[in-house]
Amino acid sequence: ITDAPGDFLSYTVDIVSLQLQRDDGTVVETLPVAATVDFARLVDLTEVISARQIPPGKYVAGSVTLDYASASRNIVVDDGSASGLVVNPVDGSGAALGSVVMQVQLDSGRPLVITARTAAHLAFDFDLLASNTVDTAAGTVTVNPVLVASVVPPDSKDLRVRGSLVGTDAAAGT
C-alpha cells in the first residue's frame, strides 16, 4: 500500500479487507487482520501489509475496503495552522462514511501471477489528492476514492514490513 502526495497531515483509516480475484473468478482474502494505516505518511514509503501465502494463480482484479467509522478524528488537513484542521469524512451526498470498497482491474497484459516458491509484488496506490475534496468551512472531506494498482511497486520508495523477524544469516545475506 502506498500513496500519492496530498494536502493532509494525517489520513488514518483502517484497511479491513484486501482481496484479489483470479482469472477463474476465485476471490482470495489476503489480509488476515485489519490494519490501521496513515496514508499521509506513505508518500515516500511503501508498506507491506500482508505477506500471507496466496494460492497460485493468475490474479486479474482486486479490492481494498477502508473503514472510515473510527477515522473521523484522524483525518487532518494542512490549513497553515500549527496543528492543522480535523475534518470529518463524508460521501458525495454529505453523509458520514462507514466502509468504502475500492475496486481495481489489473492491466490484462500484466496480471499478478503467483507460483510456488516465487515472490510477487503488487502495489496499490490510494491517491489522496484525487480522492478527496476538502471543505474547510464545513470541516468535512468528501471522499471519492481513486485506487491504482501495478504489479511492480515503485523502486524509489523505502519498504516497511510489519511482523516478527524469524532469523537472519549474515553469511548467506538473508
Task: Give the location of each predicted region.
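A short, solvent-exposed, low-complexity linear motif enriched for acidic/polar residues
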Residues: 1-174
